[in-house]
Amino acid sequence: SISAMQFIQR
């Protein structure tokens, strides 16, 4: 699964 930071930095 992905982290919140990974999702927003995308």
Curated annotation (Swiss-Prot):
GO biological process: photosynthesis
Cofactor(s) for this UniProt protein: heme b
UniProt GO molecular function: metal ion binding
UniProt cofactor note: With its partner (PsbE) binds heme. PSII binds additional chlorophylls, carotenoids and specific lipids.
Listed GO CC annotations: chloroplast thylakoid membrane; photosystem II
Source superkingdom: Eukaryota
Membrane-spanning residues: 1
Name of this protein: Cytochrome b559 subunit beta
Species per Swiss-Prot/TrEMBL record: Capsicum annuum
Taxonomy of the source species: Eukaryota, Viridiplantae, Streptophyta, Embryophyta, Tracheophyta
